[in-house]
Each structure stands twice: as C-alpha cells, then as structure tokens.
C-alpha cells in the first residue's frame, strides 16, 4: 500500500506536540561560548554528543579559545580528541579554523553562512547549527536523525539532506523553525530510533505514516 505524505494540518499537529514535550531542549552539546559550540559541532561528526561532551570537558580545560588552541598545538589537540572518529582530520581542521578566526574575524565566530562555510571542517550542517543555536537564525540543520525521521514519518521526503532541508524550509511554519532541529533530534535519538523505533511510546504514532509500526 502506498504511503501518502503528511498534509499541512498533521504536520502542524506534530510540531505542536513536539513544542510541548521538548520545550526546554536546545542542544545536547555542552558549551559556554560561541567558540566552544563551534568546536563541539565540528567534533560531533560520526560520534555521539555524549562522547563529544566527555572529550570537550577535558579539552576545554586545557584550551577554549582560538589562541589557546594554537598555543597547545596540533599534537595536543589530536591526543585529546583521539577517542573520537576522524580525529586526525578533525584536529587539523580545528587548528586551521583557529588560525583563520584570529586572522580574519578577531577570534570571533562569524555570524553568516558564507564565512562559516569557509572554515575548514565546517559544512552546511555545522553552519546551520551555529546560525540557529548561537545567532537565532531560522535555519534547519539536517543530520542523520532529522533525515531519517523526516523520511520515515513522511514529514519531508528526499534522497539527500539538502533536498530535505529545502522542503523543510518551505513547509515548516516560521514560529517552529528556530526549534525544529532540536525537537527532531530528541525524537529521533530517543523515540524514533534507527533500528527499532519505540512506536508504542510515540506521541505522534497516530499521525506518523511509517508502515511498519511496532505497536
């Protein structure tokens, strides 16, 4: 049986429900400055927020500014993030990003997409998170959880993250855009999980169009 896409009314209901249960959630990453969030998001590729937070608790105790990272150098950065995936590439990108932040932006995190995406290791998703969380821009970052959830429940289907992002920007009401990413992260991480979604505990199961619900 063909599964039809959600209509506007049911999408709105889902967002309204999420706004009530995930009201206080912003991001799972722990940070105390714009720079710390930038580094944390750069580290989060192919790893969990829990592992990133465990790593940055130690790392930020050693250095938590661009100049601080340059002072400790590449080897120290690499050794402190060794337990994370892609640590060699990430450590190199972090050091180069710190150099650029000091040279071009006075050590501050830029507040626009073009400048953010010019930083080594900062792609569209990372830029969207920074613009959304720090600068309160109504961007929608589409990561693994958001991509899976949008396709599974029929909220916004697409074969690429960019396709899904563009659809979301068109269909999500303005008042929900600022928090959309955080809500879908929570639901995808703890309820609509990758292998065995917890459909019996899901508040949107009656609206979801996933055909293999395990209720």
Curated annotation (Swiss-Prot):
[4Fe-4S] cluster binds at residues 192, 199, 202, 208. Binds 1 [4Fe-4S] cluster. Its cofactor is [4Fe-4S] cluster. One of its GO terms (biological process) is base-excision repair, AP site formation. Residues 113-132 form the HhH domain. InterPro entries: DNA_glycosylase, Endonuclease-III-like_CS2, Endonuclease3_FeS-loop_motif, HhH-GPD_domain, HhH_base_excis_C, HhH_motif, Hlx-hairpin-Hlx_DNA-bd_motif, Nth. Gene3D superfamilies: Helix-hairpin-Helix base-excision DNA repair enzymes (C-terminal), Hypothetical protein, domain 2. Its EC number is 4.2.99.18. It comes from the Bacteria. One of its GO terms (molecular function) is 4 iron, 4 sulfur cluster binding. Keywords: 4Fe-4S, DNA damage, DNA repair, DNA-binding, Glycosidase, Hydrolase, Iron, Iron-sulfur, Lyase, Metal-binding. This is Endonuclease III. It comes from Buchnera aphidicola subsp. Baizongia pistaciae (strain Bp).
